[in-house]
Amino acid sequence: LFFTMANIALPGTSSFVGEFLILAGSFQSNTTVCFLAATGMVLGGCYSLWLFNRAAYGNIKVQYIHKFGDINRREFATFLPLVILTLVMGIYPEIWLDPMHVSVQNLLCQIQL
């Protein structure tokens, strides 16, 4: 559920920062495109929640429920760094944005924006 919520750009996750920057930049140049992009993001979020609901609570037969268990230590050790990285990128995105600043400025100068 955490990664589904991160996928739909829950504030505090890495996807929120990316989608916010995209919408802020597109709003300055073309409001119509920004509105269409925001609509697509909302529809994508609805689809992600629908997909999670189907995958997690969908068509499970009672005889197979005993085969599903909770997350084990190995799976937890796999997910924990991903969860931490997703939260760090969402809470403090400057770690990744600051090194890209010079390259983005050079690109903008080349296309004269």
Task: Name these PLM-found stretches.
Residues L49-L113:
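Cytoplasmic/organellar membrane-interface segments at the starts of transmembrane helices
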Residues L1-G69:
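Functional transmembrane alpha-helices
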